[in-house]
Amino acid sequence: MDVRQSVHSEHAKTLDTTELRKKFLIEQIFTPNQYTMTYSHIDRIVVGGIMPVDGEITFDDGIGKQFGVNYFLERRELGLINIGGPAKIVIDGTSYEVGNEEALYVGKGAKALAFSSLDSAKPAKLYYNSAPAHAVFPTRIITQDDAIKAPLGDVKTCNKRTICKYLVPEVVETCQLSMGLTRLAEGSNWNSMPTHTHERRMEVYFYFDMAEDTIIFHMMGEPHETRHLVMHNEQAVISPSWSIHTGVGTKNYAFIWGMIGENLTFDDMDHIAMLDLR
């Protein structure tokens, strides 16, 4: 497990490119026949990917000890979105099939989780976030039809996109985890611009569906002290509450966002005026 400590905004603005990447960028999300796990001290989020190709993947028996509990989700909830082929997920004996760009919410207390692909030639790619949880809510699949779709932006401002909200209160009950998927239209390359921060929440972006020869310049930092990270396909970035989070790609792309913190109000944002950015 990769552990990332919290970084103060005053410290962050002194970091060079290498250190910024080390502190905030998660370069490897998917590894065939393995799971990855990054544990951030910021709001205690866990981020990772599960990619079963041949056979079944389960979390290691000792993973609970790293969280001071008996098993991973003893005091946690988990949300995942599949960006690969269809997956079979067995949770405490109950089987779920999760298709491409479908989500699964797993409630606190789920003990035995097993992940496999229905077709090894088209392996599942299960991107997940996990947050501390205080209550038990039912495990359930969220399909694309279940998700709330919201068009945003405009071709004229190069930010036309569709937000698909999977784990939000209007769709599924969670303790504090929100997740969704945003896809940019062809010809658009800016996400979340005009930008914002969340004083009351942190967020993680996971960029995917990028052509091999394309990159994204992900903007971060305080509004008056912005920095950038160059990112490639299927990489994630941790965004503290004090940081803006926006990006521009050399071609259109998609990304999954996950938030945890004080509330589940999607629109609870602190908007930043364009003229105030530095």
From Swiss-Prot:
Pfam families xref list: KduI
EC number: 5.3.1.17
Top-level class of the enzyme under EC nomenclature: isomerase
Known cofactor(s): Zn(2+)
Key word Acyltransferase present: no
Domain of life: Bacteria
Pathway(s) the chain acts in: Glycan metabolism; pectin degradation; 2-dehydro-3-deoxy-D-gluconate from pectin: step 4/5
Chain residues that bind Zn(2+): 196, 198, 203, 245
Reactions it catalyzes: 5-dehydro-4-deoxy-D-glucuronate = 3-deoxy-D-glycero-2,5-hexodiulosonate
A GO MF term: 4-deoxy-L-threo-5-hexosulose-uronate ketol-isomerase activity
Record key words, sorted: Isomerase, Metal-binding, Zinc
GO biological process, one term: pectin catabolic process
Binding note for cofactor: Binds 1 zinc ion per subunit.
Family: Belongs to the KduI family.
HAMAP family: KduI
Function: Catalyzes the isomerization of 5-dehydro-4-deoxy-D-glucuronate to 3-deoxy-D-glycero-2,5-hexodiulosonate.
Protein name, as recorded: 4-deoxy-L-threo-5-hexosulose-uronate ketol-isomerase
